[in-house]
A protein has these predicted regions:
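Residue-level recognition of single "structural anchor" positions
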Residues: 1-151
Length: 151
């Protein structure tokens, strides 16, 4: 799932399914109630109008922009993400998808920084040692029992 504030930051999270029960908690954690949100016509967004000022673009009807209502900002980000993955990594592991999303979110969110500012920000965020175990387990909820069962 992904959201982006116009002119602002993108926030991303791997979710199991794009349905109401996964999308709405993601929105609640990341978007203030009463905010304007603009989505496509995916059924998962049908009832978000109760918590947000919701406007929909109907891509199925070839509608892409209606005044200030559009989803071009997040679609631009998904395009950058896909090109970045294909051009840099070619293939990514589903196990590490959240890590890749966070890398590209950092790049997007620091798009107006100079290279020196981006480097300083990255260093300030990484002021502690990370173990290999933590690096490879990020975002995963696998127990030892589950890992053994998969082998």
């Amino acid at each position: 799932a992904g959201i982006v504030e116009r002119g602002g930051e993108v926030r991303l999270q791997v979710i199991e399914r794009t349905n109401y029960h996964n999308i709405v908690p993601f929105l609640v954690r990341n978007v203030h109630q009463g905010s304007k949100i603009m989505t496509d016509e995916h059924v998962a967004y049908n009832n978000v109008g109760r918590q947000y000022e919701h406007q929909t673009i109907k891509h199925m009807l070839k509608e892409y922009v209606r005044g200030e209502v559009h989803t071009n900002t997040i679609e631009n980000f998904w395009s950058l993400l896909k090109r970045g993955i294909y051009g840099t990594y070619h293939v990514i592991s589903p196990y590490h998808t959240q890590n890749y999303l966070e890398e590209f979110a950092f790049r997007f969110n620091s798009r107006n920084f100079t290279e020196a500012q981006r480097f300083d920000k990255m260093v300030s965020l990484s002021n502690h040692r990370i173990t290999y175990k933590k690096l490879t387990a990020h975002g995963q909820n696998k127990t030892k029992k589950n890992r053994k069962a998969q082998k």
